[in-house]
Amino acid sequence: MARDKTRTTKKKERKNIASGVAHVNSTFNNTKILISDVQGNAISWSSAGTMGFKGSRKSTPYAAQLAAEDAGRKAQDHGVKTLEVEVQGPGSGRESALRALAAVGFNITSIRDVTPIAHNGCRPPKRRRV
């Protein structure tokens, strides 16, 4: 007597947004790219992990490039043409993600580094002994 479960999914409507903000969050382990409108509502996102990279390959510049291209293409489907870029974090995928967004065909108007700087805040992790 099990019923077939039918799911009703909301169709993704195509938003016509001319300009947006690309938030590139690059850590030592991963790179995440979120493209939002000017108010901060998310349009598209991607990360190195969602592109199929695992482990230490997520932190490579190539993984960040593929993630940025994926998020950029999704945003272009919604009509985004110009981007402001906010880069955050110390990772190696910052520059390659920025170049990939430009290569997709966006007109990049500004690039800002919004990495938080601690003023003698938390104690940093211990030095690695290799």
From Swiss-Prot:
InterPro entries, alphabetized: Ribosomal_uS11 (IPR001971), Ribosomal_uS11_bac-type (IPR019981), Ribosomal_uS11_CS (IPR018102), Ribosomal_uS11_sf (IPR036967)
GO molecular function, a single term: rRNA binding
Keywords: Ribonucleoprotein, Ribosomal protein, RNA-binding, rRNA-binding
One GO cellular component term noted in the UniProt record for this chain: ribosome
Transmembrane segment boundaries: none
GO terms for biological process, alphabetical: translation
Biological role: Located on the platform of the 30S subunit, it bridges several disparate RNA helices of the 16S rRNA. Forms part of the Shine-Dalgarno cleft in the 70S ribosome.
Family, per entry: Belongs to the universal ribosomal protein uS11 family.
Subunit structure: Part of the 30S ribosomal subunit. Interacts with proteins S7 and S18. Binds to IF-3.
Name of this chain's protein: Small ribosomal subunit protein uS11
Native species: Ruegeria pomeroyi (strain ATCC 700808 / DSM 15171 / DSS-3) (Silicibacter pomeroyi)
Lineage: Bacteria, Pseudomonadati, Pseudomonadota, Alphaproteobacteria, Rhodobacterales
